[in-house]
Amino acid sequence: MLVYQDLLTGDELLSDSYPYKEIENGMLWEVEGKWVVKGAVDVNIGANPSAEGGEDEGVDDTAVKVVDIVDVFRLQEQPPFDKKQFLGFVKKYIKLLTPKLEAEKQEHFKKNIEGATKYLLGKLKDLQFFVGESMHDDGSLVFAYYKDGAADPTFLYFSFALKEIKC
């Protein structure tokens, strides 16, 4: 199994269990998330409940709907960015990430980051923002949005910010 960590923070953000599609010249990975129900375990042990006992005081089995990727990788939602905040983040992010990339990747990154930024700016009002579990200020952002008519969110990752780790 492959796990993808944030190159800057080491937070696990994705795994190969979630197929991705490269977009924007390979700068972004698009990954489909799914709403899943967590909890509400129904245990049937075949016993007859007592008619006189009333309600059982068993465990709290409240079902909760979560997005699989957010839950599995413990992503933390952040407040939305306006255009100025987003561009400020991208500028700082480029400065932090570029020195961590190999020379050939640096060239591709510098050449194509503007296109990826414009793509994200076009969706800015529809995006949800997430960071890794550590909630580090300098970490990569993970973006989520809903495609037209979709019930499940689509996630966007900066591909160059991910470090592949074999588990």
From Swiss-Prot:
This is Translationally-controlled tumor protein homolog. Coiled coil: none annotated. Belongs to the TCTP family. Induction: Induced in root tips during the externally-induced root cap cell differentiation. It comes from the Eukaryota. PROSITE patterns: TCTP_1, TCTP_2, TCTP_3. One of its GO terms (cellular component) is cytoplasm. The gene is TCTP. The lineage of its organism: Eukaryota, Viridiplantae, Streptophyta, Embryophyta, Tracheophyta. Gene3D superfamilies: Metal Binding Protein, Guanine Nucleotide Exchange Factor, Chain A. SUPFAM superfamilies: Mss4-like (SSF51316). Residues 1-167 form the TCTP domain. Pfam families: TCTP. Keywords: Calcium, Cytoplasm. It is found in: Cytoplasm.
